[in-house]
Amino acid sequence: AMMASLSSCGSDAGSSAVSSGSEPASSGTESSASQAESTSGKLTDTPVTYSYLRPENALQPYTDNCETVQKIAELTGINLDVIIVPASDWATKMNTLMATNSMPDFFYLWTDVKEITSAGALLALDDLIDQYAPNIKELYDTIPNLDKATVNGQIYALPTIRMDENLEVGATPNIRVDLLEELNLDVPTTWDELYNVLKAFKENYPDSIPWGSRGEYNLIRSYTSCVTSLGADYNLYQDDNGEWKLGRLEENYKEALAFLNKCYAEGLLDNEYIITSAQDWKSGLASGKYLFYYDNPTFINSFNTTLKETDPDARIEPIPHLANSKGETRAYGFANHEFNIFGISPDVENPELAIKFFDWLYSGEGALLMNYGVEGQEYEMVDGAPQFKAEFIEEWRGKSSDPYYAAASEKGLGKLFFTPAWYSQAQNAFMTSSPDDVTAEYIYHVYDDQRDVIVDQPVQPPYTDEEAEEIQKINQNLDDYSTTEVNKFVTGERSLDEFDAFVSELKAKGADDLVRIANEAEARYQASK
């Protein structure tokens, strides 16, 4: 449980249950064993409170004591004490809680699982899963690569599992197609063609910035950043032979930075991209400040809705992936599942009940509640599948230009709240109010001819404790330095003539050791299969 600084968040599970291996509480409250024999159908007959901490998201602010939190208590006997931390302070707050041994019971991981495990801030889950979590056990038995999401062969964090078909295509190039038509320009098919389009935008629309980015991470460091499309990688990746490499050491990363630097120097790329928040970026696209972006295309509808209020012809659309300077077209998709997302504190009261609760969240009942709400109120079953009720959708369309996130904010639904089991298409029903809407299905079919272009993001092999500790130390040396220097290359503060020196600096900080450890762990993993 967390210390007095967040005292309202602490678990009171100790008043009603006992940890594994301890004696029953002196107050005569029920033990874990008796709770396992609940007569009410709940996970526990005696109410238990667990704290859950995650970062805020501007798209979906949390509503206190929302409907799903109330329903969880009714169905399971577990009260969730939800703590939302400002996104800007999230990593700092979590590092402080970890350093002071004050972790919440459940939390959203903020950094690499290996780092948190090395600090002793995650509960080992294997034995608990084997004994108390059949739904979770089945996931690890059936989902490819999920067994890689371990440290020293043990499970320390739980995944977000997609429960329906993946219509997501990853980050894409998205552009004001109405302006292409206005200037009689073809849709660009290569990055060089896009550069010329952006130059035309700058010349003809001087009050706008041709290219806007949601901060520097989404521009140059994320697996789904435009760097991949430009033919490079920033992070660890596997080449065609299965060998792990660190992308930012490679010459093709320098070439990607050179393109970004050219766009920055000519005012085509927003010169304030480093300090641009997600909300400011969204506002910029919805107001016409930005005319192109490379990021998640599912935001397009909300942008277009606002744009059309002042310009009925305005329209952002996704376009096919662009070929790089070598004529190659490549992109990482959004993963079917996301590994190592949720953690449980090693100090959690009654870990058996805690893992049972997560197992319930992965169950049909839990998944439907956390994605769709209450049956008969927010959704109904149609041909065996959940569908939001038409009147619920229309109610929220009348309240907000971004109806899904507004509804999810009030009710406590979806991936931006607490969904270990995630229905990724749940929000699509809110996006089909007009034939002109850019729906998930529409976006999916834009890339019908590029399915082989969109590949899975790399999944690193499982590491031993010693490897994890060494990787943590190396990344501490590399991460902040890499971020600072890479942004200097983009902005021109550092010349790309010094890229080889930058690579040497990274190697001096342990980059080669990082690659070596990844390849040794991969060889060990492959030999064990």
Feature locations, PLM:
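Ligand-binding "clamshell"
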Residues: I116-D127, Q154, F303-T329
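Conserved small-residue motifs centered on glycine
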Residues: P55, W360, E365-T484, E493
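Beta->alpha turn/N-cap motifs
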Residues: L109-D112, D295-F299
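Conserved N-terminal structural module of periplasmic/extracytoplasmic solute-binding proteins
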Residues: A4, C9-E193, R221-V227, Y234-Y237, ...
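Loop/turn elements at helix/coil->beta-strand transitions in domains of secreted/extracellular proteins
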Residues: T46-Y50, T76-D81, T100-D105, G120-A121, ...
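Membrane-embedded translocation segments of transport machinery
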Residues: A323-G327, N336-P346
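Extended amphipathic alpha-helical segments with heptad-repeat/coiled-coil character used for oligomerization
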Residues: P320-G333, A385-I393
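Helix-loop-helix "hinge/cap" segment bordering the ligand-binding cleft or interdomain interface
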Residues: N152-R221, Y237-G284, K289, Y293-N296, ...
